[in-house]
């Protein structure tokens, strides 16, 4: 099992990042490159929880999302063709005095089979930089979307 810790500071509020994280509509891959529309299926969606299958490139994962705590979001693997039940993501948000937000993410990858075990080993060693890049790209994409929304709102006032 591999456990990866990621950190990034953003101009987004926790609510803005969570809004992007929990946007399961078309075009999700623009925010999260490892989640393509071909794999996306929303099984249930509530005010602070969702059950969603997503993935890309032959790897899929059914995740239970819980964002009932606005400073702590948990994604728990319910099923996958690669990852075991101990897998998932945890997002912790810390508001800073300067208005920015620190996002700390813990990704756990437990291989379910040989493919998962090998991928978990790769992710836990040389693959961390790939996960870091994907995480930063998602933060940047959500920042850009948020800025565009603010610009549109300012134009309509």
Regions found by a protein language model. Give the residues of each.
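Hydrophobic ligand-binding cavity/cleft-lining segments
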Residues: 1-47
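Short, surface-exposed coil-to-beta transition loops
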Residues: 3-5, 58-63, 84-90
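Beta-strand residues in well-ordered beta-sheet regions across diverse protein folds
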Residues: 7, 53, 76, 104-106
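A short, structured loop/turn motif at beta-sheet edges
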Residues: 11-15, 45, 66-70, 92-102
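Short amphipathic alpha-helical segments
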Residues: 13-16, 20, 126-134
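Hydrophobic pocket/interface hotspot
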Residues: 17-21, 65, 75, 103-105
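Glycine-rich portal/gate segments that line the openings of hydrophobic small-molecule binding cavities
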Residues: 25, 29, 38-82, 137-145, ...
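Beta-strand/loop substructures that line and gate deep hydrophobic ligand-binding cavities in soluble
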Residues: 78-133
